Curated annotation (Swiss-Prot):
Gene3D superfamilies: 3.60.21.10. PANTHER family: CYTOCHROME C5 (PTHR40942:SF4), PTHR40942. It holds the Pfam family Metallophos. InterPro entries: ApaH, Calcineurin-like_PHP_ApaH, Metallo-depent_PP-like. Belongs to the Ap4A hydrolase family. SUPFAM superfamilies: Metallo-dependent phosphatases. The lineage of its organism: Bacteria, Pseudomonadati, Pseudomonadota, Betaproteobacteria, Neisseriales. It comes from the Bacteria. It comes from Chromobacterium violaceum (strain ATCC 12472 / DSM 30191 / JCM 1249 / CCUG 213 / NBRC 12614 / NCIMB 9131 / NCTC 9757 / MK). This is Bis(5'-nucleosyl)-tetraphosphatase, symmetrical. Hydrolyzes diadenosine 5',5'''-P1,P4-tetraphosphate to yield ADP.
Length: 277
């Protein structure tokens, strides 16, 4: 039995299937950990959702920002962006079944000596605290008032965590940290403005996994979200979004021995160049 963590798929169904063949995925024995952003921007979001739904006994996943965007739009919140490719899900006969299942997926999980979250964790959060905070969001998404909850997700504030945060501000910051974060300011505030490579980052920003005094050290964190970072593997951070959608690759990391498998996504590079993405 092997556990394979796979980075952001974002509707790139054909590369996903090719990657499963490359790793010789055996659904009778193996498990997939998906870092979130199953959907959007790629051409086959519906096919990805259907496959994961049909194989949910072999899959563990966390929600990403594009997954949450799909859920919000499906309930009439948020705006369809020019590059969104979620109409196939919204118009599908089985769309409601898939969306009801999707919104009940976790924000974070822990197991086999690892934790997984889409974007990252604040340095002051321990793993156990982060799991409790994730449950607060999961309760809102899966509860009877989930529509109200989805309608309040959008926004970039607040930017600084305190345990005294309550209500919408508290939940929005948890969501933004776990699904959108890349950088913090050097005094610990969430910064969502810069999305590029490490080398080009403003001097006042630090990548979340290099923030000082991180309290979640010791448990390796599997994450995605940051395609400009690419694959970044060190002792306790396993970032595996290698930018398939943008013509990079789709990557799988076998957690048992840290072997990396990458499938080039050249066709998507050509699409990106043609569309100016």
């Amino acid at each position: 039995m092997a556990i394979y963590a796979i980075g952001d798929i974002q509707g790139c169904f054909e590369p996903f299937q090719q990657l499963l063949r490359l790793i010789d995925f055996n659904p009778g024995k193996d498990t997939l950990w998906l870092t979130g952003d199953l959907v959007n921007r790629g051409p086959q979001s519906l096919e990805v959702l259907r496959w994961v739904f049909q194989h949910q006994d072999q899959v563990e996943m966390v929600l990403g920002n594009h997954d949450l965007h799909l859920l919000a739009v499906s309930e009439g919140f948020g705006k369809i962006h020019r590059d969104d490719t979620i109409d196939d899900v919204l118009n599908a006969a089985d769309g409601k079944v898939l969306l009801d299942w999707l919104r009940c997926q976790p924000m974070m999980l822990e197991g086999h000596g690892y934790a997984m979250v889409h974007a990252g964790l604040l340095p002051e959060w321990t793993i156990s605290k982060a799991l409790r905070l994730a449950e607060e969001v999961e309760f809102g998404l899966s509860g009877t008032r989930y529509r109200e909850f989805l309608g309040r997700l959008y926004g970039n504030k607040p930017t600084r965590w305190t345990d005294d945060l309550k209500g919408v501000d508290r939940l929005r910051l948890i969501v933004n940290v776990m699904t959108r974060m890349r950088f913090l300011t050097r005094d610990g505030e969430l910064d969502l403005s810069y999305k590029g490579e490490l080398e080009g980052a403003p001097a006042n920003l630090v990548p979340w996994f290099e923030a000082p005094n991180r309290r979640h050290g010791g448990t390796p964190i599997v994450c995605g979200h940051w395609s400009a970072l690419g694959v970044h593997l060190d002792e306790d951070i396993l970032a595996i979004d290698s930018g398939c959608l943008w013509g990079g690759s789709l990557s799988a990391l076998r957690l048992d021995d840290k072997q990396l498998f990458s499938l080039p996504c050249q066709a998507y590079r050509e699409i990106a160049l043609a569309t100016g993405r």
